[in-house]
Amino acid sequence: MALKTFRPITPSLRQLVLVDRSELWKGKPVKALTEGLTGSGGRNNTGRITARRMGGGHKRRYRLVDFKRRMKPDMPATVERLEYDPNRTAFIALIRYTDGTLAYILAPQRLKAGDTVVSGEKVDVKPGNAMPLRNIPVGTIVHNVELKPGKGGQLARAAGTYLQLVGRDQGYAQLKLPSGELRVVRGECFATIGAVSNPDQANVVIGKAGRNRWLGRRPSVRGVVMNPIDHPHGGGEGRTSGGRHPVTPWGKPTKGKKTRQNKATDKFIIRRRAK
């Protein structure tokens, strides 16, 4: 897939850069593999905003993507087509197992309609195949990696991302993350070979505020332009600097302050991410 630029017949088209999705499926998704999706607007069960700058956007149906890849061990599946998924930046692939079962998986790079994928204990090292990390050769690029065996892939699921298997030690696999972090995961955890599709997503330019609204992203308002009741940086006559180190609306330090709290998993991190 390539990038598309546009002739500037309107101001927003001058900057707009989009991914060319002309090769993807143009019809509707498989109805049995989708379900309704209600947007939360960033509100929790009490109706309070817990995630700011969310809401609105185009209505979506949720595609049930198989992140576990343990449904049909050692049964080959043929890629029927590649599809767009509005719920993620990566493309998804519709696969049909030899017994006729349909499923969606994350599409890796270089996967195309007609290819065969399989998941199991020991399978070929080719894009789209899934197997435990203990059986994958060191140096291999992988994505959709589990943190706990059987839980389903959690690492490297966004467009263009991948991890590199750099070693194995005492039943654990050592993985290099996109951030530069080096961490270990149990060898029984499944991973899929290859990098995630749609690497051009990194070069997309939205072009106008309205396109962000279509995606469900609301405006981000700086605290320094608010009133004192709304933000610690608010108030003052004319333009002010805020008068203190940057904080969130709730007074917690931000912009570079370390926020990692989970000490229980520190033992799985060999080297922290690059600063």
Swiss-Prot record:
InterPro entries xref list: NA-bd_OB-fold (IPR012340), Rib_uL2_dom2 (IPR014722), Ribosomal_uL2 (IPR002171), Ribosomal_uL2_bac/org-type (IPR005880), Ribosomal_uL2_C (IPR022669), Ribosomal_uL2_CS (IPR022671), Ribosomal_uL2_dom3 (IPR014726), Ribosomal_uL2_RNA-bd_dom (IPR022666)
Secretion signal span: none
Keywords assigned: Ribonucleoprotein, Ribosomal protein, RNA-binding, rRNA-binding
SUPFAM superfamilies membership: Nucleic acid-binding proteins, Translation proteins SH3-like domain
Xref: Gene3D superfamilies: 2.30.30.30, Nucleic acid-binding proteins, Ribosomal protein L2, domain 3
Gene Ontology MF terms: rRNA binding; structural constituent of ribosome; transferase activity
Record's subunit section: Part of the 50S ribosomal subunit. Forms a bridge to the 30S subunit in the 70S ribosome.
Name of this chain's protein: Large ribosomal subunit protein uL2
Gene: rplB
